[in-house]
Curated annotation (Swiss-Prot):
CC cofactor: Zn(2+)
Gene (UniProt): MET
Protein name, per record: 5-methyltetrahydropteroyltriglutamate--homocysteine methyltransferase
Native organism taxonomy: Eukaryota, Viridiplantae, Streptophyta, Embryophyta, Tracheophyta
Broad EC category: transferase
Organism encoding this protein: Plectranthus scutellarioides (Coleus)
Subcellular location: Cytoplasm
Length: 764
């Protein structure tokens, strides 16, 4: 019985890659210094080898993103980056990822329904593909030099094309799969080099097989792997899927592919896939059974997994069953060893990446008759304690959440009348300007927060320092003449963790970091029990900020769906139950802010879209409870209180009616990196009556947009949106940027809004 890991986190146990990247981008270190991060790879390879894993992945390390690595491998560099051929280096690679002073970055979007982001390839009929990055082969050779024979992992050719988009100037209807014949020769070159280097297995990640694919897309898999079959001769080939069930038609296509040795499935989220396997699995093929959750931090229920694996063993045979993770461990934290302060009982319920590889191997050994009772017994005890712990169960919270069913929780007055009442109170100009919430977090500010937590500075010193920072942010916004202000969130390290720390039912890690994009990591809270709010969370800071200005000051909250989707969520009850509990806690906070005189309250639902199930058949149920949760938070406020929400990654065309159904007064949406895809919804006739602020510039790039560029973007919006509902704002919070970038960008944004106001007044 063998063991396999789909992929492993890249950042390192203490985020070594993050700091190396940021040092390189800031010009403080060399390319050679950055390349030393390959040492992280060596540590991880040894970790998996020492744990007894047989099939260890390589080429899952990346300096930014595995899809971008594939774009580099294929030489599919958009012309604006002025790449002239040859091996793609850091300059071109990071320009594609982040933009540079003269050109914007490529689009970034969610990787399926995770909080990881990939760089979307821009393709068309004129792309001249060439083998331009030998990373996959080089990493295999480096691992081999360390004495570890690995399974090189490539993003599969069909998923790569399905996840791409037509480049600028290419018809939106361009059939991306028509490029298969152009990219397969490069895959053949890579395969040939891997064979020559001594590889015996190769893994193609084809996660799009879990989506609702059309027949021509499924046919592309048959075509691609038939074309690659002779090149793959002599290699054992695994096709890996993850994140959901594989639909029956895709399962049939996948398991019928010739020349493929094994198939990997997510059996944590894929209960229906197990039924398909029971209904028929090709004889002589390997089944890589993903029974250890790659996306969460809960210890595996080993007894339950053994039962599942034994049933599968009866179908495929002992020598063809491989125990695996459900997905890459990229989506979980790195190592529990780095959590000495975590509560011991809660810690016993958890497993991070380093622990999950041990679980995988323990399951594989148990199936061969070598069950390690010293490992299995504590696991069984932890599973039992989690079910019965009073820390998990709060009857009052469960009753309050259950009482929510059967009501719409909708504000009585319609949005149009509410906006009129709010305008009378707020007296804003047309095209009002605002920002999304956070302002840059300086080294000094982080030091203050860091020293307050272990009480190296007093509460009085801490409050004084944070108030000074808020005052600085307020004064800057007033100087810039922004209409609706924010306090800049200097007291917050993270928009979810900040709230979770003040809610019951949450636990926190010191080093539970997970990559979001590039060097950006998040440290998701762990929701282990029923959720409630013991006391107000933001009222003190919001009222302090409002006292510093006559302009409206937004109260800033994170919405229940985003808290849910950006946390490691308990897996012992439905997600919607947990979401309703969080919604009730946020509702209490909204009402306390209103009582304290805050007239504009933003409830961010940045992650609403990313929680959307991968299957269309499951969308309606998710959207129903997600939108309902948002409405619960603000159903009790007055008509004159303006409720804002913010959303990230504006691929919203398919859920626009649910967004309208949220019944917010104003929605701001990240839009600038998606070529105004959002605006196409309104061009197609969808009527939106609330305020809306599609982002006018990309905060993920250091590039400072000109006034003319922003004005041009606003004009495009005015072509499809009413003047009286359009807001002008950046597309996301400014926390990760520097003041030297933020100030001129906001100056240009306000100037663009004023320019348009003047032009609109003249036109009247």
């Amino acid at each position: 019985m063998a063991s396999h890991i789909v992929g492993y986190p890249r950042m390192g146990p203490k985020r070594e890659l993050k700091f190396a990247l940021e040092s390189f981008w800031d010009g403080k270190s060399s390319a050679e210094d950055l390349e030393k991060c390959q040492l992280i790879l060596g540590i991880h390879l040894k970790q998996m080898s020492d744990a007894g894993i047989k099939y260890i992945p390589s080429n899952t390390f990346s300096y930014y993103d595995q899809v971008l690595d594939t774009t580099a491998m294929l030489g599919a560099v958009p012309p604006r980056y002025n790449w002239t051929g040859g091996e793609i280096g850091f300059s071109t690679y990071f320009s594609m990822a982040r933009g540079n002073a003269s050109v914007p970055a490529m689009e970034m979007t969610k990787w399926f329904d995770t909080n990881y982001h990939f760089i979307v390839p821009e393709l068309g009929p004129d792309v001249k593909f060439s083998y331009a990055s030998h990373k996959a082969v080089n990493e295999y050779k480096e691992a081999k030099a360390l004495g570890v024979d690995t399974v090189p992992v490539l993003v599969g050719p069909v998923s790569y094309l399905i996840l791409s988009k037509p480049a600028k100037g290419v018809e939106k209807t361009f059939p991306l799969l028509s490029l298969l014949d152009k990219i397969l020769p490069i895959y053949k070159e890579v395969i040939a080099e891997l064979k020559a280097a001594g590889a015996s297995w190769i893994q193609f990640d084809e996660p799009t097989l879990v989506l609702d694919l059309e027949s021509h897309q499924l046919d592309a898999f048959t075509k691609a792997y038939a074309e690659l079959e002779s090149s793959l001769s002599g290699l054992s080939t695994l096709i890996e899927t993850y994140f959901a069930d594989v639909p029956a038609p895709a399962y049939k296509t996948l398991t019928s592919l010739s020349g493929i040795s094994g198939f990997g499935f997510d059996l944590v989220r894929g209960a229906q896939t197990i039924e398909l396997i029971k209904g028929g699995f090709p004889s002589g093929k390997y089944l890589f059974a993903g029974v250890v959750d790659g996306r969460n931090i809960w210890a595996n229920d080993l007894a339950s997994s053994i039962t599942t694996l034994q049933a599968l063993e009866g179908i495929v045979g002992k020598d063809k069953l491989v125990v695996s993770t459900s997905s890459s461990l990229l989506h979980t934290a790195v190592d529990l060893v780095n959590e000495p302060k975590l509560d011991q009982e809660i810690k016993s319920w958890l497993a991070f990446a380093a622990q999950k590889i041990v679980e995988v191997n323990a399951l594989a050994k148990a199936l061969t008759g070598h069950k390690d009772e010293a490992f299995f017994s504590p696991n069984a005890a932890a599973q039992a304690s989690r079910k019965s712990s009073p820390r998990v169960n709060n009857e009052a919270v469960q009753k309050a959440a259950a009482a929510l069913r059967g009501s719409e929780h909708r504000r009585v007055t319609n949005v149009s009348a509410r906006l009129d009442a709010q305008q009378k109170k707020l007296n804003l100009p047309i095209l009002p300007t605002t920002t999304i919430g956070s302002f840059p977090q300086t080294v000094e500010l982080r030091r203050v927060r860091r020293e307050f937590k272990p009480t190296r500075i007093s509460e009085e010193e801490y409050v004084k320092a944070i108030k000074e920072e808020i005052n600085k942010v307020v004064k800057l916004q007033e100087e810039l003449d922004i209409d609706v202000l924010v306090h800049g969130e200097p007291e917050r390290n993270d928009m979810v963790e900040y709230f979770g720390e003040q809610l019951s039912g949450f636990a926190f890690t010191a080093n539970g970091w997970v990559q979001s994009y590039g060097s950006r990591c998040v440290k998701p809270p762990i929701i282990y029990g029923d959720v409630s709010r013991p006391k107000p969370m933001t009222v003190f800071w919001s009222t302090a900020a409002q006292s510093m200005t006559q302009r409206p000051m937004k109260g800033m909250l994170t919405g229940p769906v985003t808290i849910l989707n950006w946390s490691f969520v308990r897996n012992d009850q439905p997600r919607f139950e947990t979401c309703y509990q969080i919604a009730l806690a946020i509702k209490d906070e909204v009402e306390d802010l209103e009582k304290a005189g805050i007239t504009v309250i933003q409830i961010d639902e940045a992650a609403l879209r990313e929680g959307l199930p991968l299957r269309k058949s499951e969308h309606a149920f998710y959207l129903d409870w997600a939108v309902h949760s948002f409405r619960i938070t603000n159903v009790g406020v007055q008509d004159t209180t303006q409720i804002h929400t913010h959303m990230c990654y504006s691929n919203f065309n398919d859920i626009i009616h649910s967004i309208i159904n949220m019944d917010a007064d104003v929605i701001t949406i990240e839009n600038s990196r998606s070529d105004e895809k959002l605006l196409s919804v309104f061009r197609e006739g969808v009527k939106y009556g609330a305020g809306i602020g599609p982002g006018v510039y990309d905060i993920h790039s250091p590039r400072i947009p000109s006034t003319e560029e922003i004005a041009d973007r606003i004009n495009k919006m005015l072509a499809v949106l009413e003047t009286n509902i359009l807001w002008v704002n950046p597309d996301c919070g400014l926390k990760t940027r520097k003041y030297a970038e933020v100030k001129p960008a906001l100056e240009n944004m306000v100037a663009a809004a004023k320019l348009l106001r003047t032009q609109l007044a003249s036109a009247k």
